[in-house]
Amino acid sequence: IEEPSGSMVVDIGGGTTEVAVLSLGGQVYSRSVRVGGDKMDEAIMNYLRKHQGILVGEMSAERIKKQIGTAMAPEHGDGMTVTVRGRATGDGVPNEVEINEKMMAEALADPVGEIVEAGHFRRRSKLRGQFPSDYLSGLGFANLFV
């Protein structure tokens, strides 16, 4: 962080995410958004209800997130899979389904998109012109895993 290049730090908490860029020994940008692990868990629960017809609780959603949660779908195939147990939405009978990383990338697209947006500052007027374009283009979320 002492060099004239930047390092982006993303701290995803339960209720908020902090995004900061550190350079030349200090913080040159920061933003907080009200998106965190809790919203991701909620997104997983909603996805499973809507697309798989199964109801799961918060603890199950968090376990799924930790096992196969990803911001980017695998380049080839569907990625790793896990078995999820819950209750069928129609009759409440215990049920299980197989879900994969590709599904989780889709489920997490909205909350991850909000976090990614917090990291996009190239167009923000207070930073425009302060950094060379290659400095800004080097910052991003290419490998954001939850």
Regions found by a protein language model. Give the residues of each.
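Short beta-strand scaffold segments in enzyme catalytic cores
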Residues: 17-22
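Short, glycine/acidic-enriched loop or turn micro-motifs at the edges of active sites
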Residues: 14
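Short amphipathic alpha-helix initiation/capping segments at coil-to-helix junctions
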Residues: 101, 108, 112-115, 142-145
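Glycine-rich phosphate-binding loops at beta-strand->alpha-helix junctions
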Residues: 130-146
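Residue-level signature of catalytic and energy-coupling elements of molecular machines
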Residues: 11, 44, 119
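Phosphate/ATP-binding catalytic cores across multiple sugar-kinase/actin-like superfamilies
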Residues: 107-134
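Phosphate-binding glycine-rich/basic clefts of nucleotide- and phosphate-handling proteins
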Residues: 23-109
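Conserved phosphate-binding catalytic cores of ATP/NTP-utilizing and phosphoryl-transfer enzymes
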Residues: 1-10
